[in-house]
């Protein structure tokens, strides 16, 4: 199932980051669409001016048609009609249709048919199939047909005609084309602008038909949007806009924090760390810039959607549209049955002039010649056969309703009609295609009998045509005002778009200025770092050179000391060679002294070895000391003792 218009409004745009080439391509496409819209506006204004010119240059011409022209009418219409039908249908296929225009057409279809006097149940019988006739209006055949009908009708007849089934079939085909055109899946911004333009033009159009009292009126249907869905869509879009605004603020704050952190780290980092920090910061900065750009695109998109919803509203969903279309097509069947009323009443009627009122694609001024019924009655014998013929003609109109749109488009865009009299032709293509042969032939035969009646009713027809011209002028003024409002809306939309682009350019300039300042700060920081590095390198090189110089001086002093020591050793060696003999003698003397000292040491050691056992313990020590003291005492008093001993031993003798 295809998405509705409101569901398309809520779809998020494609958030993928695009390259600059894609953005430039989108800008050029949008500019092309705007230029195309302006060109279409100028063409529509030219069409309105041409219609006003035709209105005020209205002239009525009366001419007769020869039998040769009647035969040429019978032979020529089909190829020209087919060619114009193909061109007009091709033009309609290329024009996008807005759902608002579709609602207008559907409501036009749903208008109940007006029942006139003279309608019988016989006109509602089953309709036999009739050969299809082209509903296209050929310029040449239309003028000749007008001449024949004017020559063959009574002048006393009025121009009160009913809305024809051809117009109803044209409206039904317009509804089908609008339903087929309003179901695309996704559209770009430029396509939505173009669709808005077409829908606004469709709103200014009106389906023109003949009323019961003979006055020409337009049934313009007011396509009012659904207020509840519009309010819900506006609230939803406002919530999304607020959310995106907060996200943009958060992203900008995070980017500013990253910049401050980068500057802080870059000032207190060495060369390698600064390079790594710079790479990380550039990645983060690019990512944050892309995120902010995407969020800004989304915000602009939602602002555009909000303005569109506030201006145009939300149309109904396709389900309701197709249901109303089905009901409208059923009502078309009822309207088709009302065609007999206009045919029966047209016995007394006349043929009035046709003027192109507006460039609208949904309406056309339709008037049926009343003398067709009298001609058919003269051919078939009575008016009872008219409903049967009318039913077959209506079946042909239903089959060829698609070609009727070609007539409307041809009248809208073709400036070949020089005056309103040129446009005064039979717009009911099916009747003209199915009953041209018999009607024209009989009309030519009865043209002489109705000359007096034509002269008597000329004044009434002229007054009626003046009234129609006034009504047409009023409708043209309304259409002009509506078109003026439409172009004012387009102008305001273009100005809003320009303001958005200006705001976007200002934002881009601010971002560019921020990036430029950031790059300048980075360059200044790099210059400062380079200057500090130069100072550090110069100081370190000076310190190292001084250390090397000091080391060289120390090496030189050491080398000089070693040279002096070597010289002193050489001097000592030379003096030693001179005193070699003295040295030998001195050596021998020293050896003798060493030998004496060795003997003494041996003696002392022997005495010590003898004394040591006597002094190992305390008792031995005291005993040894007592013995030494005693020996010393004896040695000191040896003479006395020796004398005493001698006396001791000598006394007994």
UniProtKB/Swiss-Prot annotation:
Per the record, its GO cellular-component terms are:
cytosol; endomembrane system; endoplasmic reticulum membrane; endoplasmic reticulum-endosome membrane contact site; rough endoplasmic reticulum
Positions in coiled-coil regions: 228-313, 458-576
Alphabetical UniProt keywords = Acetylation, Coiled coil, Endoplasmic reticulum, Membrane, Phosphoprotein, Transmembrane, Transmembrane helix, Transport
Compartment(s) of residence: Endoplasmic reticulum membrane
Chain segments carrying region Disordered: 1-35, 58-78, 112-165, 204-227, 415-437
In this chain, composition skew of type Low complexity spans 153-165
Residue spans, topological domain Cytoplasmic: 1-591, 646-653
An individual GO BP term? endoplasmic reticulum organization
Q: Which InterPro entries match?
A: TEX28/TMCC
User: Residue spans with biased composition (Basic residues)?
Assistant: 113-125
Basic and acidic residues composition-biased segments: 20-34
Q: Which regions are flagged for Polar residues bias?
A: 64-74, 135-144, 204-218, 424-437
Topology of the protein relative to the lipid bilayer: Multi-pass membrane protein
Q: Which domain of life is it from?
A: Eukaryota
One GO term in the molecular function aspect is: identical protein binding
The membrane spanning regions, by residue number, are 592-612, 625-645
Q: Which residues carry this modification: Phosphoserine?
A: 382, 414
- Residues bearing the modification N-acetylmethionine: 1
Family per similarity comment: Belongs to the TEX28 family.
Quaternary assembly: May form homodimers and heterodimers with TMCC2 or TMCC3 via the coiled-coil domains. Interacts with ribosomal proteins RPL4 and RPS6.
Q: What does this protein do?
A: Endoplasmic reticulum membrane protein that promotes endoplasmic reticulum-associated endosome fission. Localizes to contact sites between the endoplasmic reticulum and endosomes and acts by promoting recruitment of the endoplasmic reticulum to endosome tubules for fission. Endosome membrane fission of early and late endosomes is essential to separate regions destined for lysosomal degradation from carriers to be recycled to the plasma membrane.
Tell me the protein's name.
Transmembrane and coiled-coil domains protein 1
Q: What organism is the protein native to? A: Homo sapiens
What is the name of the gene encoding this protein?
TMCC1
